[in-house]
Amino acid sequence: MPAKLSVNLNAIAMLRNRRDLPWPSVTGLGRAALAAGAAGLTVHPRPDQRHIRFSDLGDIRALIDDEYPQAEFNIEGFPSEAFLDLVEKHEPEQVTLVPDDPMQATSDHGWDFMSKADFLAPIVARLKGRGMRVSLFADPDSLGYERAKAIGADRVELYTGPYGATHDDPAAAARELDRLEKAARAATALGLAVNAGHDLTVDNLPALVKRIPQLAEVSIGHGLTADALMYGIPVTVSRYITALAG
């Protein structure tokens, strides 16, 4: 089964927030993505609400519950108490925990599982106790994956930023694919499902899914939104689903 596509709405929200206006509509374009075949919607709410606003979460939750109950809501972020309160209020199917400073521009590294296991363990238990699947953002080096499994994570999301950055360097892309494949195999051997995200496009997805056929889900926002400016959401989502099929 091809990996599922979760459309990250942050870039749409950032465009909306350039003006004090309700468009482009985050939920409206999320609806269009789901109608076109996306399996879910992802958001990364940050403390300053510079893209996704806290008020968006209830609207997205209602959209999925009322119109696309088979779809999944994925909320990602650093597990501060404020973030955990938001997550518990809106009950996403999946929570992706990332280690970044809430004020940085974007996630750019995975957890240090060896040093952060004691910090993460009670948080993972808390979320799973509420029925949420937990994915941990991970560098593609397999270091500490056994600790991620031991503290109860269901999945790891492989950080694919370095792979995305090799768009004009085939040799470097091959090296990054080797790293990602090795990391995915290590995670799978431990019983962790594998997600991936960051700078994925219709051009680099086919090679990735060929090397990681067990990939469960990709979360894509920036590249997909850029393509949607040219082709529209329905066509763009269809193109990404085709790319995921290899």
Swiss-Prot record:
1-deoxy-D-xylulose 5-phosphate binds at residues 46, 51, 106. CDD domains: PNPsynthase. Its EC number is 2.6.99.2. One of its GO terms (biological process) is pyridoxine biosynthetic process. It comes from the Bacteria. Its main location: cytoplasm. The record marks 157 as: Transition state stabilizer. The keyword rRNA-binding does not apply. SUPFAM superfamilies: Pyridoxine 5'-phosphate synthase (SSF63892). GO terms for molecular function: pyridoxine 5'-phosphate synthase activity. It catalyses: 3-amino-2-oxopropyl phosphate + 1-deoxy-D-xylulose 5-phosphate = pyridoxine 5'-phosphate + phosphate + 2 H2O + H(+). It is found in: Cytoplasm. Signal peptide: none annotated. GO terms for cellular component: cytosol. The active site is at residues 44, 76, 198. Pathway: Cofactor biosynthesis; pyridoxine 5'-phosphate biosynthesis; pyridoxine 5'-phosphate from D-erythrose 4-phosphate: step 5/5. The keyword Phosphoprotein does not apply. PANTHER family: PYRIDOXINE 5'-PHOSPHATE SYNTHASE. Catalyzes the complicated ring closure reaction between the two acyclic compounds 1-deoxy-D-xylulose-5-phosphate (DXP) and 3-amino-2-oxopropyl phosphate (1-amino-acetone-3-phosphate or AAP) to form pyridoxine 5'-phosphate (PNP) and inorganic phosphate. Homooctamer; tetramer of dimers. Belongs to the PNP synthase family. This is Pyridoxine 5'-phosphate synthase.
